[in-house]
A protein has these predicted regions:
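Long amphipathic alpha-helical segments with strong coiled-coil/leucine-zipper propensity
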Residues: 43-131, 140
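Short helix/strand-capping turn motifs
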Residues: 122-125, 132-149, 155-158
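Short acidic, glycine/proline-enriched loop segments that cap or flank alpha-helices
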Residues: 34, 54, 128-129, 143-152, ...
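Charged, amphipathic alpha-helical oligomerization/scaffolding segments
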Residues: 87-94, 132, 136-139, 159, ...
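Alpha-helical oligomerization segments
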Residues: 151-216
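Leu/Val/Ala/Ile-rich N-terminal alpha-helices, chiefly Sec-type signal peptides and the beginnings
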Residues: 1-61
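Short runs of predominantly hydrophobic/aromatic residues within well-ordered alpha helices
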Residues: 39, 43, 59, 63, ...
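Alpha-helical repeat scaffolds in large eukaryotic proteins
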Residues: 19-22, 26, 47, 51, ...
Length: 216
């Protein structure tokens, strides 16, 4: 049986290099947001946990297990939100895998430069899918912010946290609970979401225009 290339040591090493590169870019892009006391908690959750390079695998693996374990046991709209998170993670993971395959083809070994990253990014020829990914991130953010204002969600999460270890989903439930607590500190999410969308679209279009010479 052929070995799945995405599970090889070299592939996983390059994927971590890619995710570190992207995480560092995210931290540079949103340094001012992270430093703003108003957005301290949500900034820490987004840029240090949601987009951090470490522990991606447990989130990608546990999301599906979480969805299965929660069905019928938690506030329905919360399960819908988790479904959106699963979709976002699957898209992001698929994009990363495509990038890593191109990195291997380009001979990338121990690090990736901005020029290499931009060329590989554009070579995937998936402009519209990247736009969808950005908009889905915004949608997920707004959904979870709305849920953080509902008392029934707090009750559901506390109930699930109690049984999480039994279902083997403690880490991911803790992750989502941290997100809930972070969102709850923000009354109006518009500035955060609008800033994220604007900067991600600018980054996306800048890469495209730099490599292709065309503007969106």
């Amino acid at each position: 049986m052929d070995t799945d290339v995405t599970s090889t040591d070299n592939f996983l090493k390059l994927k971590r290099i890619l995710q570190n590169f992207q995480s560092e870019r995210i931290n540079r892009t949103y340094k001012d947001i992270e430093a703003d006391p108003e957005f301290a908690k949500i900034g820490n959750f987004f840029f240090k946990k949601l987009y951090a390079s470490e522990d991606f695998s447990f989130r990608d693996t546990s999301m599906k297990k979480l969805h299965k374990a929660l069905d019928g046991k938690i506030y329905k709209n919360m399960l819908t939100a988790v479904t959106k998170v699963i979709e976002l993670h699957e898209i992001s993971d698929a994009q990363d895998n495509l990038m890593v395959k191109k990195m291997i083809a380009a001979g990338v070994e121990d690090s990736i430069t901005m020029e290499q990253y931009q060329k590989i990014y554009v070579s995937l020829d998936n402009y519209d899918q990247r736009i969808y990914q950005i908009n889905l991130s915004a949608e997920v953010t707004r959904i979870f912010h709305g849920l953080s204002k509902k008392w029934i969600v707090a009750v559901s999460l506390k109930t699930v946290k109690t049984a999480a270890a039994m279902f083997g989903i403690k880490e991911i439930v803790d992750f989502i609970y941290d997100g809930y607590v972070s969102f709850k500190t923000i009354d109006n999410i518009d500035f955060f979401v609008d800033t994220m969308v604007q900067r991600e679209l600018s980054w996306h279009n800048e890469i495209w225009s730099t490599i292709t010479g065309k503007t969106a």
